[in-house]
A protein has these predicted regions:
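Short, low-complexity, glycine-enriched hydrophobic/amphipathic alpha-helices that associate
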Residues: 269-314
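Extended serine/threonine-enriched, polar tracts that run as long, contiguous segments within proteins
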Residues: 154-223
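A eukaryote-biased signal for short, well-structured alpha-helical docking elements
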Residues: 1-11
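Short aromatic-acidic-glycine turn motif
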Residues: 55-68, 217-223
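A beta-strand/beta-hairpin structural motif
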Residues: 66-109, 129
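A short beta-turn/strand-edge loop motif at beta-sheet boundaries
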Residues: 41-48
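Short beta-strand elements
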Residues: 75, 124-153
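Internal, hydrophobic beta-strand segments that form the core of beta-sheet-rich folds
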Residues: 53-57, 95-101, 109-128
Length: 315
């Protein structure tokens, strides 16, 4: 018996956890539904808590370096303390609200290159090794996102890459500690003016703030630079607007200005991915995660889950 208790403390013969999602596809503002299925081990187990949380890969800039970390940004308790008998089977239903700002991972039925998202289940076991499970999740765009992305495609822009950048865009009300950048190669009719465009959605229950960063080409006597535009759109406009005309107007207005939205974060201004100008990094108030104590959104869990993410998303 003592030997079994010792093995259980190291996770041998302990309880197992497997989360089954009713549907792994969702959208910002909706829910993820499923069941956490438990099976008891060789000995009774005291479960302290069961939680589910959304995790994703985020680009983190520090000085002159940049690295990717895996971050849990939204968590919910599924169950409090309970006792699990040997070999007992238990299924616990849950419904996890998906934050409005959750980044989009899939468009037109395809995973965006550079994006990854998962639902992590954690089983906290008293006096034993905690157990966990990780399930792939696909976050699809809302109608307002789709209309704007459709307009970029109709205008001839080609998708390049998407990623998440740690930080907050100054002047924008964010609840998550990162923002998504969807990058496009310039359409032919804009190629003489800009090289690339980065599109950011910051979504709320009322609508979406659209942030554009245009990498402007330099002229014979002028250097290239970044230009920024910011536009607020209600969800109700999704189906009653000529989005091709609107997005074209946004781009022309944005490229006519020079860095009007730029605001410095902590430290000297730095280039996005270190390759040009002051970039979106200049707009970002790059508050270090964890400054707001106890904020689940700021929990980096790279070491525990880097291996688990290798099978999906990624580059």
């Amino acid at each position: 018996m003592v030997f079994k208790k010792m093995l259980s403390a190291f996770g041998v013969g302990g309880p197992s956890v497997d989360t089954v999602l009713t549907n792994p596809n969702t959208r910002p503002g909706l829910t993820l539904d499923g069941h956490v299925n438990l099976v008891g081990g060789d000995a009774p187990a005291s479960i302290e808590q069961i939680t589910v949380g959304l995790v994703t890969r985020v680009e983190i800039e520090g000085g002159d370096t940049e690295y990717a970390g895996v971050m849990e940004f939204h968590r919910m308790a599924v169950s409090g303390p309970l006792q699990l008998a040997p070999k007992q089977q238990l299924s616990i239903p849950f419904q996890l609200p998906v934050p409005w700002e959750t980044p989009v991972t899939d468009v037109y039925g395809q995973r965006l290159h550079g994006m990854t998202m998962g639902l992590r289940t954690e089983l906290a076991v008293a006096r034993a090794v905690d157990k966990s499970d990780l399930d792939q999740v696909a976050v699809h765009p809302l109608p307002i996102h789709e209309r704007i992305l459709d307009a970029f495609q109709a205008l001839g822009f080609r998708f390049k890459h998407a990623d998440l950048e740690r930080g907050h865009i100054r002047g924008v009300q964010q609840t998550l500690p990162f923002y998504q950048e969807i990058e496009f190669f310039a359409a032919p009719q804009y190629a003489g003016t800009i090289n690339e465009v980065e599109l950011t959605f910051v979504t709320s229950q009322q609508g979406v703030e659209v942030i554009l960063e245009c990498d402007k080409r330099g002229g014979f006597l002028s250097a290239g630079h970044d230009a920024f535009g910011r536009y607020a759109v209600p969800h109700s406009d999704a189906g009653r607007t000529d989005w091709v005309q609107v997005v074209d107007g946004w781009l022309r207005e944005t490229t006519s200005r020079y860095g009007n939205l730029r605001a410095h974060g902590f430290g000297a201004p730095h280039g996005h991915h270190g390759h040009r100008g002051s970039g979106m990094g200049g707009m970002v108030a790059g508050a270090a995660l964890g400054m707001a104590g106890g904020l689940v959104a700021g929990e980096l869990i790279e070491d525990a889950f880097e291996g688990d993410f290798g099978d999906f998303g990624g580059e």
